[in-house]
């Protein structure tokens, strides 16, 4: 009886000890789990805070990007409007310059034709005057009263060398011939003057046409440079320097 009681107490002690150990182990595991849970919560909170901070940064960047996009679109719209205005201004200037060049070219062609006609007229007048002068000289040299108007070489004497015994009729004939010669020489001189004036006008018009062509080229270079500079500025690259104006070839008269 005593033995059974002793054995029973020993079993209960062992069982209690086992249960105590199990309880202690469970408590330790519970503490470990609680510590791990707290650590996980802290880590998750840190991750959440970092994610929220990153989200705030991304939201700010998104707002800035949207703002830059709006500003870029506005700048693009302004540049398109400016480009359209420049194109319109350049088109009008180009049309005006081309019209002036065509007008000047037509005037130059007309003056060249006038020069050609004047040259032909001058040549014909010189030939006719020379022929008529030779005829007059021949008649006057054959006349004993009129031969003293010309020298031995055939040149016209400007000073009067009339003789006192010659009549009024002979003097009138001399004066008439001299007047006719002077009129012919004056007509030739006027024709030569018109020819020179026409050539000078052609040179002046060609100079004006060259200046207009330079203005057209300068306007093209200016518009091209402004357009590219606007594109370069929008993309953040180096602006383009304007191209030099080339001189157009001069047309021979």
Curated annotation (Swiss-Prot):
Coiled coil segments of this chain: 8-222
Keywords (A to Z) from UniProt: Coiled coil
Region of interest: Disordered: 233-253
Entry protein name: Rab GTPase-activating protein 1-like, isoform 10
Organism: Homo sapiens (Human)
Gene: RABGAP1L
């Amino acid at each position: 009886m005593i033995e059974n009681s002793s054995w029973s107490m020993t079993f209960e002690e062992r069982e209690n000890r086992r249960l105590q150990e199990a309880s202690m182990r469970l408590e330790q595991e519970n503490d470990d789990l609680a510590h791990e849970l707290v650590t996980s919560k802290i880590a998750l909170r840190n991750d959440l805070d970092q994610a929220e901070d990153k989200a705030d940064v991304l939201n700010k960047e998104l707002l800035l990007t949207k703002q830059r996009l709006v500003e870029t679109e506005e700048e693009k719209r302004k540049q398109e409007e400016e480009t359209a205005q420049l194109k319109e201004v350049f088109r009008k200037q180009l049309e005006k310059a081309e019209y002036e060049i065509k007008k000047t070219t037509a005037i130059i062609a007309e003056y060249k034709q006038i020069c050609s006609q004047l040259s032909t007229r001058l040549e014909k007048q010189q030939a006719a005057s020379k022929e008529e002068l030779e005829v007059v000289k021949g008649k006057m040299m054959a006349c004993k009263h009129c031969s003293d108007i010309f020298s031995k070489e055939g040149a016209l004497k400007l000073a009067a060398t009339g003789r006192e015994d010659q009549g009024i009729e002979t003097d009138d004939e001399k004066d008439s011939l001299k007047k006719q010669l002077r009129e012919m020489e004056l007509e030739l001189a006027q024709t030569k003057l018109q020819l020179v004036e026409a050539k000078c006008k052609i040179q002046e018009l060609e100079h004006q046409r060259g200046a207009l062509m330079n203005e057209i080229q300068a306007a093209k270079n200016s518009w091209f440079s402004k357009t590219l500079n606007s594109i370069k500025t929008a993309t953040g690259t180096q602006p383009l320097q304007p191209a030099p104006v080339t001189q157009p070839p001069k047309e021979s008269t």
